[in-house]
Amino acid sequence: MKNYKIEAFENLVDAFSSLPSVGKKTAIRLAYHAVMENGFAAMKLAHALETGVNVIQKCSKCHNMSEDELCTICSDPYRDSSKLCIVQSAKDILTIEESGQFKGVYYVISEVRDMDEDHLFYAVGGVREIIFAFPPSIATDTMILYIEDKLQGLKIHFTKIAQGVPTGVELENIDIMSLSRALEARVKI
């Protein structure tokens, strides 16, 4: 039986399939759209990807995404540098910034084993409150305890974001850990 596959198309499908949350069928649809229906948009995407990979780096202070040595948040003199929000990923910074509720600065720590203690001490200079914005898990609770222990000699107030019942979700669809934390952190009305 003869193979009628087009190698360049298969390579494009494989490239799309390597992205998070993109399965084979979606990759085929994206590849087809790119090469057969909107070549200009595909070239624009290719250029944006190449530019992003070549230009975006980690901020030297907080590890956020940046085009310069310091990200736009660390270099903003109007941010409240007394409040430091520690997150697991630069993607988390994007999410928090979209909420418009936090005006402090950030620090990204993905795992304890990746943490540079000297760099962390540099990042917390002048900080009066550290807010941990981690998803709830035993691993993140352990990381919080570890960081608190390392910084205990400093006069810093430690908090973490509230966790509990999301808006619009039925109680039967909530995991037990989230429901337990919501009950523990209940507020007076």
Where are these regions (language model features)?
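Extended, structured, electrostatic nucleic-acid-contact surfaces
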Residues: 1-20
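Conserved, well-folded catalytic cores of nucleic-acid-processing
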Residues: 19, 37, 52, 65, ...
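Extended interfacial segments that mediate partner engagement and assembly in macromolecular machines
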Residues: 27, 76-137
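Cys/His-rich short segments
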Residues: 47-93
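Long C-terminal interaction/binding lobes of large macromolecular proteins
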Residues: 121-189
